[in-house]
């Protein structure tokens, strides 16, 4: 559809822990679309969003919201109710992918390789017992992650029970549920997919430690290799095949990013899908698009062109 004659709202900011990143993503999309001559308004989302959308006469929404209330199907459902087409996955796909436990169960049921994990709620006594069970089955490092946040907010890498318990407490401070996931040693890769088209793989190489929030959004903390070097054809094909399968199984559309670990034997392990990838100057999806000659204005326009209801 041609959106040139429509009033476009870039929805950004919001109420989650990822607000600051969202503001940067939204600003990048706003500038890109404005440079192409679109009628675009940047809207910082709060609890009065319905009134703002009506007042501004928004006819299509470009979503740059990260985390809860933005990537979990909430804003998508509101826009469906208001009859405003929007970018990215629909309500169901957004909810599935935002819930790391739910999406991993779906991956596992469909035969897609994903690291072993357990899920924990706010009951610390139960958490202690489950961590003991996890340690009985697996040795070495694990990652503790909130089940419904992105941008590596609240994530810890832990070895041993004491670190795991501290990691669980940290994760539960930002969410009422978390998971302990077996750490797979290997290369960190990410695959950006736009409307079913896979972009070149990126290898993520943190200067030190693991790829946490600071490494993601602080210049100079991480090296990004585009395309990922020294990948044999078999591993490359496997990553793309698994990423596209996950994209379709979850019902995704638009721009989505799949994160992987490639172990020492060349086996890719699917970690998660990100349904509204970051669009900042350090973000991965724009880097992958650039590698195939798609600059930010064109990427923003392609994202916009995929806007729809349901």
From Swiss-Prot:
One of its GO terms (molecular function) is ATP binding. Pathway: Cell wall biogenesis; peptidoglycan biosynthesis. GO terms for cellular component: cytoplasm. It is found in: Cytoplasm. Its EC number is 6.3.2.4. GO terms for biological process: cell wall organization; peptidoglycan biosynthetic process; regulation of cell shape. It is an enzyme of class 6 (ligase). It catalyses: 2 D-alanine + ATP = D-alanyl-D-alanine + ADP + phosphate + H(+). SUPFAM superfamilies: Glutathione synthetase ATP-binding domain-like, PreATP-grasp domain. Signal peptide: none annotated. It comes from the Bacteria. Belongs to the D-alanine--D-alanine ligase family. This is D-alanine--D-alanine ligase. It comes from Magnetococcus marinus (strain ATCC BAA-1437 / JCM 17883 / MC-1). The gene is ddl.
């Amino acid at each position: 559809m041609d959106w040139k004659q429509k009033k476009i709202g870039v929805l950004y900011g919001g109420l989650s822990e990822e607000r600051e990143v969202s503001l940067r993503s939204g600003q990048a999309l706003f500038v890109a679309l404005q440079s192409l001559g679109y009628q675009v308004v940047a809207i910082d989302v709060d609890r009065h969003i319905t009134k703002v959308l009506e007042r501004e006469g928004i006819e299509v929404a470009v979503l740059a919201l990260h985390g809860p209330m933005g990537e979990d199907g909430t804003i998508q459902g509101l826009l469906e109710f208001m009859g405003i087409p929007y970018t990215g996955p629909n309500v169901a796909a957004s909810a599935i992918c935002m819930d790391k436990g739910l999406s991993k169960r779906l991956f596992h049921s469909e035969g897609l390789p994903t690291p072993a994990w357990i899920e924990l709620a706010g009951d610390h006594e139960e958490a202690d017992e489950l961590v003991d069970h996890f340690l009985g089955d697996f040795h070495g490092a694990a990652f503790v992650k909130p089940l419904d946040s992105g941008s590596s907010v609240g994530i810890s890498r832990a070895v041993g029970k004491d670190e795991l318990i501290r990691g669980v407490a940290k994760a539960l401070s930002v969410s009422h549920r978390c998971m302990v996931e077996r750490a797979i040693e290997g290369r960190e890769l990410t695959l950006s997919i736009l409307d079913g088209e896979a972009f070149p793989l990126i290898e993520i190489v943190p200067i030190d430690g693991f790829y946490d929030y600071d490494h993601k959004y602080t210049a100079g903390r991480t090296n990004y290799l585009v395309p990922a070097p020294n990948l044999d054809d078999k591993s490359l094909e496997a990553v793309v095949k698994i990423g596209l399968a996950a994209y379709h199984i979850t019902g995704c559309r638009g721009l989505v990013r799949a994160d992987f670990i490639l172990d020492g034997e060349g086996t890719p392990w699917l970690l998660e899908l990100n349904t509204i990838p970051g669009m900042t100057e350090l973000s991965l999806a724009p880097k992958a698009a650039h590698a195939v000659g798609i600059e930010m204005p064109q990427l923003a326009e392609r994202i916009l062109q995929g806007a729809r209801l349901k």
